[in-house]
């Protein structure tokens, strides 16, 4: 929904999900957002594994500015959809483990994309210090994601 909000009324937002139970929840949330926001992008949902629905995705736009992949296995998806990115378009991959970051990196390069950044995001709670000011609280750190960001710099 955050992506839809950033696109505003002039954007095109395409979601792809192969699992009906996940799609149903997401689509209900999108409808609630559409009903409560003044501007909402043109939204299209495509059902199926992303590798198998590229032609249907392409019916909504020839090129995309961004693609976000949240999958357990990225290489086949990257290979399938990298051509959907316009020049300057970026792909973000949420990876469950570091070995998947490496495989996503290799797949992105093989697909003609340039890896801009790869790393881990962490959650760290802050609180008031006893003598004033703010500081990280003592305690466990929360892992939020391994990410890889790649960009299409040219169309070959």
Task: Please provide the spans of the model-predicted regions.
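Conserved SAM-binding loop of SAM-dependent methyltransferases across substrates and taxa
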Residues: 1-9, 82-83
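C-terminal substrate-binding/active-site "lid" region of AdoMet-derived donor-dependent transferases
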Residues: 75-151
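S-adenosyl-L-methionine
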Residues: 12, 16-74, 130
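Short alpha-helix immediately C-terminal to the canonical SAM-binding loop
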Residues: 1, 22-24, 101
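Short, hinge-like loop/turn segments at secondary-structure boundaries
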Residues: 9, 32-33, 64, 110-112, ...
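A short helix->loop->beta-strand "cap" motif at the edges of active sites that frequently abuts
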Residues: 10-11, 89
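Flexible, glycine-/basic-rich loop-and-beta segments that form/coincide
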Residues: 154-156
